[in-house]
Every structure is written in structure tokens, then in C-alpha cells.
Design a protein with these regions (language model features):
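N-terminal helical cap/lid subdomain that shapes the substrate entry/recognition surface
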Residues: 2-93, 97-101, 126
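Conserved phosphate-coupling serine/threonine residues in phosphotransfer and NTP-handling enzymes
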Residues: 12, 109-111
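Asp-based, Mg2+/Mn2+-dependent phosphohydrolase catalytic module
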Residues: 1-3, 96-99, 112-113, 117-217
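Residue-level marker of regulatory loop/turn positions in helix-turn-helix DNA-binding domains and
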Residues: 87, 108, 140
Length: 217
């Protein structure tokens, strides 16, 4: 029986795709690097920032990463005022329903915890969430299972009573690696086929479909 939902943020709860793509592309311009296509950037969503940068520029010297990160965060802070995250349809209402029904709800993201917490507050989701974990709260990020394992340990919930929900294959891989159930959402930054290939137990097209699935695990 599912007692805990561990939710991704970007592409699962909120649409941040335009913000992430435009931030990356503007950082590339400022740093003098070739501007990558939007889809190439979208494919890195869900990875920690540094890993995403190295995926886009495999030959980038590691000593160049701090400047990259600094420029990225400067651009991000500027752009988020104009194209900040928007909740996907039905997210807030569904979280309120799940919370009222007694489910524990947590968030595990590759975003830094200060940014993640700020977005959750701004979007009015904090009343429903009991635990928030960002990239800086673990030593190994998605697709490694550590974010799920730490959440389970801190909340004293066994893996077989948890459902990991995310839009990217790395979310599914993270959940499976921890022994939890997994559910992909097809409306985010990936697609149904990729999520099924990653091993998702279920894939939904709307966040509001999730409550009706829980009794089936």
C-alpha cells in the first residue's frame, strides 16, 4: 500500500522548460560558447546543473565549471521574474486531495534546495509537502537512488510503500534503484515511450490521474 509520494519538480509539478532553455542559451552566449538547440538542453533537465553542462559540452574543462555555474545562476535569477515556473493543470488540487486523504508528499529534485523551496512557497504547494530534498542535500543525484533512499530513511517509510513520480527517465531509474514503485508523467520534458523504456510501472498523461492509480500498487 502506498503511503508516500516522492515527486520531481521540474516537468512534473511545474513547467520550467522555457526558463531552463533560455537561461542555458543566454549563459552560452555570455560565455562565448556555441548555443545549443532547445531539445539538446531539454534532454539534460533532471540532471544536476554541472552534469547537464558537461553533457552539452563534454570537452569543457572542469575548472571552467564554476564560472559557468555563476553565469547560469545570474541569468536564471533575472529571467525567472519574467518566465517563472507555472504549475501544470490539476497539480495543486490533486496535491490537496492526496494530503487530505492522508498521503505523505515529498519532493526530490536536482535543483538546489534554496531555489526549490522558494518555488514551492511561491506556487503555494508547501502546505501539502512534508519533506523537500534538493541536489545539495545528497552526495549522489539522480539517477542514483540516494535521493529516494534518504527520503525513505528520514520519513521511516519502506520502499514498497513509496511511489516516485517524475517526467524523465532519470526519475524512474532513481526510484527503481531504491526499490520503490514508479510513475512517469508524459506531459513534461520526456515522453511516454522513454519513460516506459526506463521501466516505469505506470505512465499518466495528467497529474490528476495519480490518485486513482494508488490502490493498484
Amino acid at each position: 500500500m502506498i503511503k508516500l509520494l516522492i515527486l520531481d519538480f521540474d516537468g512534473t509539478l511545474a513547467d520550467t522548460q522555457e526558463l531552463i532553455v533560455r537561461t542555458n542559451q543566454e549563459a552560452m552566449r555570455r560565455l562565448g560558447y556555441p548555443v545549443r538547440a532547445a531539445q539538446d538542453i531539454i534532454d539534460t533537465i533532471g540532471l544536476p546543473l554541472e552534469e547537464g553542462i558537461l553533457t552539452l559540452f563534454p570537452d569543457l574543462p572542469h575548472e571552467a565549471l564554476p564560472e559557468w555555474v555563476k553565469v547560469y545562476r545570474t541569468v536564471f535569477e533575472s529571467l525567472k521574474e519574467h518566465i517563472g515556473p507555472q504549475l501544470f493543470p490539476g497539480v495543486k488540487e490533486t496535491l490537496a486531495q492526496l494530503h487530505a486523504d492522508g498521503y505523505l508528499i515529498s519532493v526530490a529534485s536536482s535543483r538546489l534546495s534554496v531555489s526549490l523551496n522558494a518555488f514551492l512557497v511561491d506556487l503555494g504547494l508547501m502546505p501539502y509537502i512534508c519533506y523537500v530534498l534538493g541536489a545539495d542535500n545528497v552526495t549522489q543525484a539522480k539517477p542514483h537512488p540516494e535521493p529516494v533512499l534518504k527520503t525513505l530513511r528520514d520519513l521511516h517509510i519502506p520502499a514498497q510503500e513509496a511511489l516516485v513520480v517524475g517526467d524523465m527517465p532519470v526519475d524512474i531509474q532513481m526510484g527503481l534503484g531504491a526499490g520503490a514503485y514508479t510513475c512517469g508523467v508524459s506531459y513534461g520534458n520526456s515522453n511516454r515511450e522513454a519513460l516506459k523504456k526506463a521501466g516505469a510501472h505506470r505512465v499518466v498523461d495528467l497529474f490528476s490521474e495519480i490518485p486513482s492509480l494508488l490502490s493498484g500498487f
